[in-house]
Amino acid sequence: MLVVSKVIQAKFATGGCTYDPTTLELTFGTFNPLGGGYTHGLVIENHLADNSGLAPGRVNTNDFQVEFAVIDYAQIDGPAVILPQQIVPGNSLIRTGGKGITQVVIIPPPVAQAIGGNTMKVRAQVQVYGRLMDGSRVKSSTYEYVIQADPTFVLKGPTCTAPQVAVACEGSNQDTGTGCG
């Protein structure tokens, strides 16, 4: 079984921004739809068993290669807006019995443009698709994540000393890790 277990922010670290599967989930996302889309990391757990012991010389084929995510949207409140299903790229290799992260644009720019200057809550229903190492197509569980679209949202970044500049890991229009780089 392939399970999307949480949505996490990138964290600023020396040398750039990183994702860590032990990061706590931000239970409610926020972004400014006038500034573009909304991106975070999905933590995926591969609960499939290592199948290399089924026959002599067999190799494990249950590692999961992420290819894309299909995202459906359910509007919770606000003015009626059509939010069409989106297919967005993803990439990661999740080893058997392990966890991994794929960065996904949960609300792509076309959906953000449809929301426009409206304030609303949107439920994103994300399912990740890919292949096992034997080529079979598989998909993860569906994960629901609620995001507040707020055209007045402004990310509060750090105060940096020159020559450093403020860095917003996943974009300055959304909740994300920040630092000086």
Residue ranges, per PLM feature:
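Non-catalytic macromolecular-recognition regions in eukaryotic signaling proteins
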Residues: M1-G181
